[in-house]
Amino acid sequence: RSRKSRKRSSAGGNAVIVDGYSKQWLDQGFCWVYPKEIIRHPPGCRPGATVQIRSEDGRDLGAGIWDEGWIAVRRFRQDHGPIDKAVIAFRLDKAIALRRELIGEQTTAFRWVNAENDGLPGIRIDAYAQFLVLTLDSPSLSGLVEPICDLLEERLEPRGIFQAWRPDPRDKLDTSKLEHRLARGRAPAGDVRVTERNIACLVRPGAGKDIGIFPDMRDNRA
């Protein structure tokens, strides 16, 4: 939505109120709100909660997921409303359509979803042949795992979906509690053979975020 179409709201008690600096960046399409940009937020707000974002003058700036780390809010929509399966499906379908247009059959290891670049901040989905790895930047996004996995099974029919974590070191999380796991389907019997421009290699999707090949580094291997 354009800035002109955003409505003023007099009720700011249930919203995150951001300063003018944050508003400028959000108006340009950025997905993040940092702690120092927040004037006030709902009391008792916990990581994973959906919050509305508003400027000091009451303008709606969208909705996001609250966190208590280096990033305070990841914005998932620029209008007022829930962050539900329909929102995720819309972004995911656009990302899938783009990759199907650009990536040829000779490449079976690539990134389906690249976080905020596809409107899904903090979420990455990599393909390794018939297996997928869903990587989250923060535990605050855990509530999206099930709807994302449902959509991936409907759209891509993978043999298995692994969930991995890649938290920012500035968040100072206890990473011992962040387990890489098989979220859906079954695990491969051994290494998985993938191709990149017809060059084959073996990977281990169940090993987590660093499994032997980085899909976003393909140009460096060209």
Q: Model-derived features: where do they sit?
A:
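Conserved alpha-helix/loop element of class I SAM-dependent methyltransferases that forms part
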Residues: 48, 210, 215-222
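Short amphipathic alpha-helical segments
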Residues: 84-91, 140-148
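A short interface-forming secondary-structure element
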Residues: 129-142
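Conserved hydrophobic/aromatic pocket- or pore-lining residues that grip, position, or stack substrates
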Residues: 130, 201, 220
